[in-house]
Design a protein with these regions (language model features):
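Short beta-strand-to-loop junctions in surface cap/lid or active-site-entrance loops
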Residues: 1-7
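Short beta-strand element of the alpha/beta-hydrolase
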Residues: 8-19
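Hydrophobic beta-strand anchors of alpha/beta hydrolase catalytic cores
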Residues: 12-14, 44, 160
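Serine-hydrolase catalytic-loop signature spanning alpha/beta hydrolases and amidase-signature enzymes
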Residues: 19-22, 44, 84
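Short amphipathic alpha-helix adjacent to the substrate-entry channel of hydrolases
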Residues: 25-47, 54
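Alpha/beta-hydrolase active-site loop
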Residues: 64-91
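Primarily recognizes the serine-hydrolase "nucleophile elbow" in alpha/beta-hydrolase
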Residues: 83-156
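The feature captures the conserved acid-bearing segment of alpha/beta-hydrolase catalytic domains
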Residues: 125-197
């Protein structure tokens, strides 16, 4: 529901989970989360994205190309959705300096990866302006895929809140990698954030 005043509102963008092969942005179990933020004065945007793992086998340390492609597609779609909000921020009454991204499982991987790639000016970051950065990240059981070991940021990441169960069998709580290539989960990222005094 849009605020009828002219006051600009912070925005929460949410990316659903489902292993990059299923899920829906309007699933009933997400509605309380959306409503919580809407009542706090946020414009809530539930993002849809291409499901790149449909028809693919589960990723392994030696065969993760389909997963890498799926993450890239999701990040690209999140960037495109963000660009739309930036373009129409006036009409939507969104404060573009207060756009927070949040996601669950595959969605959490997407939002963490998106902020990581944006802060590092990676090739995927051609959709959004160089001057734009997300204001915050809320991750429910996410991680970052890296080919260079534990992810390092050229620009400090957005303030990030991690939620992750240590018994997670799908998204690694710590990390799952072969040599330096693999998925770095919430525990390893949180330790890195603490070491580097990231927010």
């Amino acid at each position: 529901k849009m605020d009828s005043s002219d006051t600009l509102q912070p925005c929460l963008m949410f990316v659903f989970g489902g292993g990059f092969k299923q899920g829906s942005r309007d699933a009933a179990h997400y509605l309380p989360y959306y409503n919580h933020f809407a009542k706090k004065g946020f414009t809530v945007v539930a993002v849809d994205y291409r499901l790149g793992m449909i028809g693919e086998k589960a990723a392994t340390p030696l065969n993760n190309k389909p997963l890498v492609r799926a993450i890239s597609l999701a990040v690209e779609d999140l960037y495109s959705a963000t660009e739309y909000l930036l373009k129409y921020a006036g009409e939507l009454k969104i404060d573009t300096s207060e756009i927070v991204i949040s996601g669950s499982s595959a969605g959490a991987i997407t939002v963490l990866q998106a902020d990581y790639e944006k802060r590092n000016n990676m090739p995927s970051d051609t959709i959004l302006s160089n001057t734009f950065q997300y204001a915050g990240v809320i991750s429910f059981a996410g991680g970052i895929f890296s080919t260079e070991g534990l992810p390092v940021y050229k620009i400090a990441p957005a303030p990030t809140l991690f939620f992750h169960g240590s018994a997670d069998k799908l998204v690694p709580y710590n990390h799952r990698s072969f040599l330096k290539r693999g998925m770095y989960g919430s525990e390893s990222l949180a330790q890195s954030f603490k070491l580097n005094a990231y927010p």
